A protein has these predicted regions:
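Short, low-complexity disordered leader/linker segments with a strong preference
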Residues: 1-48
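A structural preference for short, hydrophobic beta-strand core positions in alpha/beta folds
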Residues: 83-87, 210
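Alpha-to-beta junction loops
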Residues: 79-81, 97-111, 192, 206-208, ...
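Short, polar/charged alpha-helical segment
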Residues: 59-84, 199
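Extracytoplasmic "Venus flytrap"
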Residues: 50-67, 88-93
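Short, hydrophobic alpha-helical packing/hinge segments within bilobed ligand-binding/sensory domains
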Residues: 94-98, 216-219
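An acidic- and aromatic-residue-enriched active-site/binding cleft used to recognize and process polar
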Residues: 54, 88, 196, 213-214
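Contiguous mixed-secondary-structure segments that line small-molecule binding/active-site clefts
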Residues: 35-38, 70-74, 112-208, 213, ...
Length: 231
């Protein structure tokens, strides 16, 4: 699972940045395989899954999405399945969601694919892509253009089943401690911007930094970073 502000003419650098939130589920937890149990027994069986996220608990916007998912699942299953949502650092680090689900220690996770670029470089194309598609175009590609099948193919070796779970849509660029009036102003700029967007910043002379959302305000305030992008 971002928001942003550059002055013209560089204002359009991330204009078509969209951010897809991902619900990742441990393969083998779907219950599709035959258990040999009586149907009435299965109906009475209760399931309680743990969902870890990259956002602080009840974080505005992104952090509320997994809570809504948990509520809907409990309602639609008539209470047969409950999902306990954990914020970043409550059980795993903000960037530990992928490994937690892949290893089987947790059944579900809610995060953004560009955090795993070291493990799955192609996952970045399912998160924020500079000059990329709008929210509607992303949805069309994912659901009607074969995108979802590709996504699941690249996650399959990690025993993970990805499900789209939110899209922030087209965004601006970022928040800065100084005005950006020319390309020279980007030289040496330390900006929290993961994924492909970070590669663009690096080519322009900036220094991309990856930080969890819960640390951004303090990092910007204390000068650890000069700028940040976020929803």
């Amino acid at each position: 699972m971002v928001s942003y502000g550059l002055r013209k003419p560089r204002k359009n650098l991330m204009r078509n940045l969209t951010y897809i939130l991902t619900l990742i589920v441990l393969v083998g937890c779907s219950g599709e395989q035959s258990t040999g149990l009586d149907e009435d027994v299965l109906k009475e069986k209760k399931y309680n899954w743990r969902l870890v996220t990259s956002w602080p608990k009840n974080y505005p916007g992104l952090g509320m999405a997994p809570e809504r998912i948990a509520d809907l699942v409990e309602e639609m299953s008539n209470g047969q399945m409950t999902i306990t949502v954990y914020g970043a650092e409550e059980q795993v680090p903000a960037f530990g969601v992928f490994d937690a689900v892949s290893s089987g220690s947790h059944q579900m996770g809610h995060s953004g694919g560009y955090f795993w670029k070291g493990k799955v470089p192609a996952a970045q194309f399912f998160t924020s892509v500079p000059f990329g598609l709008t929210a509607d175009e992303i949805n069309a590609w994912v659901y009607r253009g074969g995108g979802l099948e590709l996504w699941r193919e690249i996650y399959q070796p990690f025993n993970i089943y990805p499900i789209p779970a939110g899209n922030t849509g087209t965004q601006m660029f970022g928040w800065f401690n100084k005005e950006i009036n020319s390309l020279a102003d980007i030289k040496g700029l330390k900006m929290r911007i993961p994924g492909i967007g970070g590669e663009v910043l690096k080519e322009a002379g900036g220094i991309p930094v990856t930080l969890p959302g819960g640390e951004l305000f303090t990092a910007l305030q204390t000068g650890v970073i000069d700028a940040t992008e976020w929803v």
